[in-house]
Amino acid sequence: MISNLQKETWAQLLGKLDRLPHALLLHGAPGVGKLALAERFAQLLLCEQRISAFHHEGQGVAPCGTCDGCRWFLAGNHPDARIVEPEAVALALARPAPVAEEGEEEKTKDTKPSIQIKIEQTRALADFLNLASHRGGRRVAIFHPAEDMNTATANSLLKSLEEPPPDAMFILVSHRPARLLPTIRSRCVQVPVPLPEPKAAAAWLAAQGVRAPERWLAFAGGAPLRALDYATGERGEAVERVLRGIASGNLAALGEIKERDELEPLAEVLQKMALDRAFASLSGRTKYGGAAVPGDARAWLAYARAMGRNRALTRHPLNPKLFAAEMVAGMPKT
């Protein structure tokens, strides 16, 4: 499992069991296994063999996987656990969508899945946390990604963090903790989740059937789950097409993209290529596995920033062909 690549972080979490805080904030780059760690720790807290498990030492402590608590958690229906995340994230992870409140079904039937955690979700969570535990133990709530909250939702969570119900445990998972309210961060014990050791991550990818794992790991910036997504998903196919176009020098073809779904992968590849060109100029090294071709570092860094902005713009209505052509045309010549 991916959490095996984060043994040191898992050991840190186990070290907090004796004096468990009411809120943890696991933060790090996307794709390093933060959610897997959060879910595994939540499962451990709900494991009905946990009393004997907690007396073991070292990284071998883990949920038993066979008790009712573990089986319910793994099936996604433990009565004392909640995962609070945007509808779009739940859909991408093949989880059941949050149950609509009365009167909400008709309003949401024809709308796109939300990309934010809704205020209704935190209110429902507050109701859940104020009930007695079904199994006589803790109640655990995972927020993922925690930064995907608007101001009203964040303030609702803050209220629960300021006055946590007895035996309630909050686990926040964040790719960008700076986007959280400072008052939320200050009420959590922060646990940084680093990039795994590259050789171990490449070996894990190879075990998942990924070909050329080092290449995909480099392109993903060292994040193994992102590398797995690139190597096995539709996004990876789009990235491959862009990489082949760049390798062949056929940049004009990249500007002929007509499908909106290929715009963000194009912007991502161009951004990472630009960063590699800048890094090569400054240090002779690259970060994302691109060719170490030096150039005007300032120009390539400016282009990388522009592509970062374009990655956000690709979610909005626009002309795919025109937008792609503009991105390619703006590439530095040196």
Task: Name what the model sees in each region.
Residues 130, 155-169:
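Conserved catalytic/switch belt of AAA+ P-loop NTPases
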Residues 151-155, 321:
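Conserved strand-to-helix beginnings and helix N-cap segments that scaffold or border functional pockets
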Residues 1-152:
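Clamp-loader machinery-focused feature within the broader ASCE/P-loop NTPase space
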Residues 1-61, 166-169, 175-334:
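Charged, glycine-rich active-site and insertion segments that engage polyanionic ligands
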